Amino acid sequence: MSLLRKFKIMHMRINGFYGGKARWWLSAKQYDQKYNTQYTASQKKWAYKHGFLPAVVERYGINDSNVEDFISLYDYCHIFPVNDIFRKWINDRVTTRNVLKPFAQYLPEQYFHLYRRDTDIQVVKLLDCPAEYEESYDGILQLIRDKGKVSLAKTLGTNFITLACEDGQYSIDGEAVSDEELISRIQDIRSVLVLMEYVECGQAMKSLEPSNSNYLKLIVYNKYGDNPKVGQAYLSLNTGKPSGYREVFESDGSVSMGSEEDLDAKNQSDVQASDTEIDQDDDTIGRNFMESEVVLPRRDQQPKVTRRVFVPVSLEDGSFDGGKQLVGNTITELDQHPVTGAALKGRIDNMAQLLELVETIGKFIPQIEYMSIDVVLTDDGFKMVDFSAHPSYPQVVGFNEEMTDYLKLKVRLKKEEASKWENKKKNFKKKSNTFLWIRLTRFLCPPKMRPLIYKWWYITMKDDLFSKNGVPLKTKRWAYKHGFLSYRLEQYGIDETNYKN
C-alpha cells in the first residue's frame, strides 16, 4: 500500500469513516480508473466528485439537476455503521436467533454450530436441536436422514446450500455424495457454519420461478427509536442456477476477537484481479454491503446480466406488477420472468401481518435503527431467513424517496459530528494508536498475531513487570521472553526443562 493511499485512508477515518469502507471506496475508484474505459476522464471526475462511480451514474441517469435525489456510494460508506456495536445482534445467525427468541416461530430452526478450533471441527448443539441428536458427525447424519433436507450456511454469510438424504443417498445441492464424503467436506471447512432448517418456498413464489432461492427483501428503519417502519420492499427472484457452495465450503472465515472499530488489520486486496466486481469486506460487519452491485466491465467484455430479477412490492396492499433486471449497465423493465415466462404480477396475501410483525420486532430491538430482512414466503406463512445491519447499496431497485430522505438525514448528522474539532482530534488519536499497534505487531510478533491480542499482552506484561509479586526481575525477563507472565511460572511449575510442554 502506497504512502499516499495510507494518508487518504487516515484522512477519511479521521472524518468518521470506518476503515473497511474507506478502503472499499478508494479501491473502487482505483479499479474504475484503471479498467473502466467506457467513460471519459471528465465523466469519471464528475462521478467521483459527487460520490458515485460512473457506471452507477449512467445506470440511474444521475446528473446535475437530480443528483440530490440520490444517496451516493461515498455517503453510504460514510454512515456505516448506523447501528454501532449493536449491529452484531443481527449480523450473526446464531446471535440473531438468541436475541429474537420470542419470535423463534418466524425464524428457521438452528440445529448445530460448526467451527474450527486449532485443527479440529467443533460440533455444538443449538437451541432448536432435539435432545436425541448427539454433538457429533453421527448426530449430523442422523438429523439429515430424519429431516430429509437441511440448510448449511455461514453464520456471517448470505448464501445457503442444501444437505439432503433420500432413500439412504446423501447429496450436497443435488450432487450425490457418500456419508464419508459429506463429513470430509465439513471437516475441510474454513468458515463458521450453522446447520439449520430447510425452508421451502411456497407455491405462489414457485409459480414465478421454481427454485428455492427466491425471497422478499424488506428494508427497515427506526428513525426515532420507537417507530420502526418498513421503508421499501421488493421480491428477489432467481434467474440462473443458484449456488452457495463456494461461499460456504471454500471461502475463509474467522471469529472476531475484540473491537473491529479499534483494530481493523485484516489484509485485503486493493484491486481485484480476476473478476468484474469489486471485492467486498468479508468481516463481521457489512457482510453483504455491495453484493455485486458495482459491475465494472473490462475492455471487450460482453454485457453482464445479473442472476436475479427484482420486483418492487407495494407496502399498502402487497401487490406487485412488473420487475427489473440489470443487463450490462442498463436497467431493463420486465413484465415476465426472463426464464420461466411467468407474469410478474400478483399480491402477497399476508403482507399486513408481516409488516406488523416487523414493527413489533423493531420495537423489541430499538437499538437496531437500520436493517434489511430476507423473508421466504411459504405455503403456511413466512420465515425470516437472513438479517443485515447495513443493507446492500441497491443494484437495480434504487432507494425510494422515503429511504433516501432517511439516509440523507444520517449523512448530515454524521458529517456534523465528524466536522467537530474535538471529534477529529479523538479520531486521529484513536486511529494513530491503532496504526502503531498494527505496525508493532507485524514487526515484533509471529505471523497472524492479532494486534488487539498483542496490545493486551503488552499492557498485561507491563502490569506484571511492575507488580510486587516476589518474582525476581531476571526471572520475569525469562518469563516474558518465553511468552509467560511471571506469576504463572510458580503456579504451573514452569522452568527451562518443561516450558515447551
Regions found by a protein language model. Give the residues of each.
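C-terminal active-site "lid" helix and adjoining low-complexity regulatory extension at the edge
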Residues: 330-359, 363-368, 377-501
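Active-site rim elements
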Residues: 83-87, 203-207, 342-348
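Conserved N-proximal alpha/beta basic substrate-recognition cap immediately N-terminal to
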Residues: 6-141
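Extended, charge-rich helix/loop segments that form flexible
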Residues: 36-40, 44, 50-65, 254, ...
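Glycine- and small hydrophobic-enriched segments that form the cores of compact globular domains
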Residues: 108-164, 170-172, 187-195
